[in-house]
A protein has these predicted regions:
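Bacterial N-terminal signal peptides
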Residues: 13-25
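Predominantly soluble domains enriched in secretory-pathway, periplasmic, or organellar proteins
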Residues: 4, 27-392
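N-terminal secretory signal peptides that target proteins for export/translocation
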Residues: 1-11
């Protein structure tokens, strides 16, 4: 009957084709890409990090966070590392490319060890299937990576040599434009975040416990020599969409003590630290919600320790704080997979993804402003170590 109808009424074919095109296009319009970088080299066995013998390739999982529930779109092999903050991934504002850095690799001289790497990989997200189109050498042990708000500049923090690499972006092509030093080689630049106007960026330094302020003018990036001192080992950092406040994690001494997150008032010139809050053992990642009303923080919570350790817990945590000016108030928290890494938000602020290295999975959480609940899980190939969405 359908075939007969189409043959006898060909004038309806354009309308049907248009309808089908609309149906297929609708999900794409709502799509939001998240990319998880997964490390296959390192596993944690009862609190001890071990190198995997003949590991499978590291890879990146591409996820549609706009789908309900979020769904995997594909996977591409790409070098990466759990060493470093969970912002080892960046996605361009137009979601055309993703960048993944690799801080460590298997030591060619001794496959039972890892050694420093220096690679940044470019993934074409519009290709079918997605593919690595370039591998670029940056500094020693690259850790964090971010696009400028206009997508024309990329900054990479290099923990291994105390520098920040500068790359120009033209379409899907990246070109190294230079490098600046922050302190000495042991300053440990960990992550970099741009302010929304693109004229400044903040860099956490877990080696000497400072936060640097960079000035940005096109591809000219300079250290202003202004710096802030928060807690011990400042690590991940996230800046609100309005550019008025930043929240960063401080990893502390790693002895099982409670650690802190810190609030920076960006309206002040120079920026100033105005508050710190105790959150538990080793806050790893911090990500603002798209509207800047909340910040989600992942807490390792002792889950990466031996089971006999007094500070051991069998789960990590995601803690969501409500932001009111420069004050943070705990809104909700949930138990998640252990050795917890990065966290991202959906555009509407109702869904979060949290990485669990111990379980090779990403927890899917729902949030309604009051309750935070795990609603599902996405299995990945390896330990999920870094995750981002496009920051628009």
């Amino acid at each position: 009957m359908i075939s007969h109808t189409w043959r006898s009424a060909p004038r309806f074919i354009p309308a049907v084709a248009l309808l089908l095109a609309t149906i297929w296009a609708a999900p794409a319009l709502q799509a939001q890409i998240a990319v998880s970088a997964n490390d296959n080299k390192v596993v944690n066995i009862d609190g001890v990090n071990r190198i995997v013998e003949n590991p499978a390739p590291d890879n990146a999982t591409i996820i549609d966070l706009g789908a309900s529930p979020p769904k995997v779109l594909g996977k591409v092999n790409v070098p990466t590392s759990v060493v470093g903050p969970p912002q080892s991934v960046a996605i361009s504002p137009d979601e055309s490319i993703a960048l993944v850095v690799a801080s460590t690799k298997i030591d060619p001289a001794d496959p039972k060890k890892t050694t420093a790497d220096n690679k940044l990989s470019v993934i074409d997200l519009k290709a079918s299937p997605p593919a690595v189109t370039a591998t670029i050498e940056v500094g020693g042990s690259p850790a964090g990576v971010s696009f400028s708000p206009d997508g024309k500049l990329v900054l990479v923090t290099n923990r291994g040599d105390g520098t920040v690499s500068i790359l120009n972006v033209a379409g899907k092509t990246l070109t190294v434009a230079g490098k600046i030093a922050l302190g000495d080689a042991k300053s440990g630049p960990s992550h970099v975040a741009f302010l929304p106007d693109g004229k400044r960026a903040l860099v956490t330094r877990d080696g000497d416990h400072r936060i640097s302020v960079l000035s940005v003018d096109g591809s000219k990036v300079e250290d202003t020599k202004q710096y802030l001192v928060a807690g011990i080992r400042p690590y991940s950092i996230s800046i609100s969409p309005k550019g008025d406040v930043a929240v960063l994690t401080n990893q502390g001494g790693g002895q099982g003590d409670t650690d802190i997150i810190t609030v920076i008032d960006l309206k002040k010139n120079p920026p100033r630290i105005v508050d710190s809050i105790s959150v538990g053992q080793i806050p790893e990642g911090a990500t603002m919600s798209p509207d800047g009303s909340y910040v989600a923080v992942t807490i390792q919570n002792g889950s990466q320790r031996p089971k006999t350790h007094q500070a051991y817990n069998d789960h990590g945590l995601v803690m969501v704080y409500r932001i009111n000016g420069t004050k943070l108030t705990l809104a909700a928290q949930a138990k998640v997979g252990g050795w917890t890494q990065g966290v991202v938000w959906s555009k509407d602020g109702k869904t979060l993804l949290s990485q669990g290295m111990l379980v090779n999975a990403i927890d899917v959480l729902s949030f309604d402003g009051k309750d935070l609940k795990v609603t599902g899980s996405i299995k990945v190939d390896g330990g999920p170590a870094g995750i981002r969405t496009a920051e628009k």
